[in-house]
Amino acid sequence: MTNWKHFLDEEQDRFLSELIEFVKIPSVSASPDYIDDVKDAADWVAKRIIKAGGENVEVMQTGGHPCVYGDWLHAGSEKPTILIYGHFDVQPADPYDLWDTPPFDPVIRDEKVFGRGASDDKGGMLIPIISFEAIKETTGKLPVNVKFLFEGQEEIGSPELPDFIAKHRRKFSCDMIFSSDGLQWTEDEANLVTSLKGLVGAEIRVTGPTTDQHSGLHGGAIANPLMAISQLVASMKDEKGKITINGFYDDVLELTEEDRADIARVPYNEAEYIKELDVTELHGEEGYSTRERLCLLYTSDAADDTPCVDLGGRRII
């Protein structure tokens, strides 16, 4: 029987074609214009799990974008059950003029697939499906029981997922969850992430005049909402990067020496990191290394949710 490694090599062209086909589906979860496309992506995933040898495959409704479930539970009750998670929705692709090629017409360049979602997370979630297929196809079995759960709303914060999982907790019961949504440390070094930062979000709305007011006529007499929100956001951190939001640090655990030692053992090239981000310098709270700030330190950031601004001569408050 063919070795699973040989199987992967022999089927490489097929897997690549499948990824390109998958990326062509514009499954943007943030826009109602793409609801049907997200459903199409869910159907594609369900068919791919079946093709790989998965069983009990179904597209499940959540009240929002759907989830896809599948399993293979023949390793035996004494063997652990691993649930593999991923997502098939993608971020919006605009601004389109910054793309060298159409985001949903993927191309291969420099041995990489360029297209929206190729890495986050369509390529990532295909890997465990392909691995499952390779082992099952070449050995006829797996050493563990496997469940798949792929969702279509991760990029908007998975709003329906908690209640959905609670409702179907027996179906999703497992001994371990493996997330396919992540990054490899470097091209030559793999990594196993054991925890992730949590997230708390708040929306800030600043209102001003109900109609456009000319800055030349009314500037200096009324408050400018853009200036106000800029001042508000800037006040969230001091010049040393420390967060100034009242109560932010309450009950926050400090990094231990063991935490710092664990992070320090991980290979890291700061010059390469700066080059990769195309910035001139790094910034953050004093007293911590870049890796400590990235991996374990609490942060506060502002995410822009304002509409595009036409700067063609308009002077509006």
Name each model-derived stretch.
Residues S119-S195:
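Acidic/histidine-rich catalytic neighborhood of metal-dependent amide-processing enzymes
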Residues T244-C295:
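Long, low-complexity segments enriched in small/aliphatic residues
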Residues V309-I317:
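Hydrophobic alpha-helical segments, chiefly the membrane-spanning helices
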Residues K79-F150:
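Active-site metal-coordination/substrate-binding segment of hydrolases
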Residues V193-T207:
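Flexible glycine/proline-rich, aromatic-decorated loop/lid segments
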Residues Y298-D305:
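Conserved small/polar residues in nucleotide/adenosyl-binding loops
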Residues G219-K240:
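A short core secondary-structure module
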Residues T2-Y96:
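N-terminal helical capping/dimerization or prosegment-like subdomains
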